[in-house]
Amino acid sequence: MRNLSVGSIDFTKAHVSVTLADGRILRDTLSRNPDLLKASATQRSEWTLLDDGLVSWPHLGDKVTLDTRWLLWEALCKQANDEAMAKGFKLDELQPRSREIVALWRLEADGYNGGFMQFFGNWGEENCRIALSALQAIGADATYAIVARQREILERIKDHPDLKSYEDLWSLLAKEEQDEIGDKLDPEFWKAGDEIPRLAALHYCECFT
């Protein structure tokens, strides 16, 4: 198993900063970690890096952890989205790595907000194709199967004469297709999608050993 190498962990009044061995700094707010917020400097210094990328403070309780892969994924998404903004959000002008990260971020953001149809309606076929390819590349098999099935359901209406824009998709689906996408598969995505940040961080960052 490849793991992050953590050099140090530092605290300010409001934040915890994780410095990786390659010099990269990951930050999180202490408001997300109330037990760390209340802990003394000595207690905060007694951390352990677990094999799965979690930083643990076992003396403060089993649930007092910091997921470095999740923080790393946040940082990778911000970097890729900043690159996309500089290019006018034209994904074809990005390097493949950044393109995939942006597509996955959009899938996460819209998928957890309004579901697959919001993602597909906002970003279209090309983004969906890139996201599916990226899910396969990072090994997010459970999430890939769900999103691939949702995309497959839309295939029936791709040549429908009343399909003028992505906004028409939902109304052209049969009731059972709507139910499968929204009532069955979206909730499955909300559970399975938890695998994306950690697998994506592992795949896209070279700071693992």
How should each PLM-predicted stretch be described?
Residues 7, 28, 33, 44, ...:
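Functionally constrained cores in energy, signaling, and assembly domains
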Residues 1-90, 123:
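Motif-centric detector for short Cys/His coordination patterns
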